[in-house]
């Protein structure tokens, strides 16, 4: 009395999950490649005195997320700006950049190509910690596929003192 899930790989169907608990209605299939489509089939079963009875299969195609952005770093930090750098995601159309401010994540930029791998956030306050996150996206036949977000933290530097401030200390 449960469910069996099969994944089509290597030219054949392989059982990847089985439960005898009919209240379990989801599972996670691991070791899949990013930005790939897979065929799955699911069927219910019931154990009887005469053996196991199976329902018909329900088939579905699933698409995995894009690979996460790799190598995200906050570099070129100044008193009022942070430069974000990351590695190219070969499958991406572009990248979405967000900043955490006011208690929520706010989109601050979207790149429209896969070759822009830096973004400088300007107009920041001195000596202040900030959080940024980046995810890749891919436009694919009218649908958009996303990676998960990757987060980086950085603190802006203390600005320079005005020259009259330094001379007033003497």
Where in this protein do the model-derived segments appear?
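Extracellular low-complexity, O-glycosylation-prone stalks/linkers
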Residues: 1-18, 24, 41, 57, ...
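Short stretches within intrinsically disordered, low-complexity N-terminal or propeptide regions
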Residues: 4, 36, 46, 76-83, ...
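Tandem-repeat/low-complexity and Cys-motif detector
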Residues: 18-19, 28-31, 47-49, 64, ...
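Ser/Thr- and Asn-enriched, surface-exposed coil loops between beta-strands
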Residues: 21-26, 76-83, 113-118
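Beta-strand-rich modules
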Residues: 29-48, 121-141
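Pro/Thr/Ser/Gly-rich low-complexity, intrinsically disordered linker/stalk tracts
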Residues: 34, 51-91, 126, 142-170
């Amino acid at each position: 009395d449960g469910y069996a899930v099969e994944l089509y790989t290597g030219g054949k169907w392989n059982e990847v999950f089985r439960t005898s608990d009919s209240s379990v209605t989801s599972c996670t299939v691991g070791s899949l490649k990013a930005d790939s489509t897979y065929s799955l089939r699911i069927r219910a079963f019931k154990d009887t005195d005469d053996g196991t009875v199976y329902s018909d299969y329900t088939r579905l195609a699933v698409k995995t997320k894009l690979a996460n952005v790799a190598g995200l770093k906050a570099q070129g930090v100044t008193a009022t700006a942070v430069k974000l750098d990351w590695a190219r995601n070969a499958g991406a159309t572009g990248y979405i950049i967000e900043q955490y401010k006011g208690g929520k994540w706010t989109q601050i930029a979207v790149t429209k190509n896969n070759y822009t791998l830096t973004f400088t956030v300007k107009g920041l306050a001195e000596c202040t910690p900030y959080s940024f996150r980046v995810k890749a996206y891919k436009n694919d036949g009218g649908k958009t596929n996303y990676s998960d977000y990757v987060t980086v933290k950085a603190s802006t530097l203390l600005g320079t003192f005005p020259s009259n401030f330094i001379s007033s200390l003497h």
